[in-house]
Amino acid sequence: MNIPPIYTGSIVPLDISNIDTDAIIPKEFLQKVTKTGFGKHLFNNWRYTDHNNKILNPDFNLNKPCYRESTILLTRDNFGCGSSREHAVWALLDYGIKIIISSSFSDIFYTNSFNNQLLLITLDKTTIDLFFNLIKKNKINEITVDLIENYVFFEKKRYYFYLSNFHRMCILNGLDEIDFTLQHYKKIKKYGNQIPNFFVYNSIS
């Protein structure tokens, strides 16, 4: 999944710090390695009042009518901490989340996200506080992200975020690290075949 250079979407606030991967998707749902079908289990223990019958909790923001179509998640610091399960990223994407905005992310979650084209935007805590307050006060839930200039546009103001050229290229083109490497296969093969035989058993075929 790739994101266009300029993307506008609705934003859902989740005003909680240290959301770990078990909260994102509990371990009992990690029984397959395909990337689809996990969206219904996203935030399972918060999202449902009856977990067996999947009865929605009306007080949880993702279940409120004004946020049900949201594709951008706004949350607090240290999002994605805990175990390294990639299923957490799959659940977010399968639900429809394309972008997460926070003041910080777990390192492993950060890597897993970009390998699956889930865009993570890091802003300072003051800006995150401002966004939460604006949403609460004005009931605003639309935001624009410019991936070319690295700006978030919200309430007629823009906020810079850092994104490496490599991650930008992967997000815009729907690539992971392996896809990117394969784009340079011919150069890798040529270099490998130039290595003296005493360094390798066989040349790259």
Swiss-Prot record:
A biological process term (GO) from this entry: L-leucine biosynthetic process
Sections of the chain in a coiled coil: none
Top enzyme class: lyase
Gene Ontology cellular-component terms listed: 3-isopropylmalate dehydratase complex
Catalysed conversion reaction: (2R,3S)-3-isopropylmalate = (2S)-2-isopropylmalate
Domain of life: Bacteria
Pfam families: Aconitase_C
Keywords, sorted A to Z: Amino-acid biosynthesis, Branched-chain amino acid biosynthesis, Leucine biosynthesis, Lyase, Plasmid
InterPro entries: 3-IsopropMal_deHydase_ssu, Aconitase/3IPM_dehydase_swvl, AconitaseA/IPMdHydase_ssu_swvl, LeuD
Keyword Ribonucleoprotein: no
Signal peptide: none
Gene3D superfamilies: Aconitase, domain 4
EC number(s) recorded for this UniProt protein: 4.2.1.33
Molecular function in Gene Ontology: 3-isopropylmalate dehydratase activity
Pathway(s) it belongs to: Amino-acid biosynthesis; L-leucine biosynthesis; L-leucine from 3-methyl-2-oxobutanoate: step 2/4
Function recorded in the entry: Catalyzes the isomerization between 2-isopropylmalate and 3-isopropylmalate, via the formation of 2-isopropylmaleate.
Record's subunit section: Heterodimer of LeuC and LeuD.
PANTHER family: 3-ISOPROPYLMALATE DEHYDRATASE SMALL SUBUNIT, 3-ISOPROPYLMALATE DEHYDRATASE SMALL SUBUNIT 2-RELATED-RELATED
Protein family membership: Belongs to the LeuD family. LeuD type 1 subfamily.
NCBIfam families: leuD, PRK01641.1
Identification of the protein by name: 3-isopropylmalate dehydratase small subunit
Organism this protein belongs to: Buchnera aphidicola subsp. Thelaxes suberi
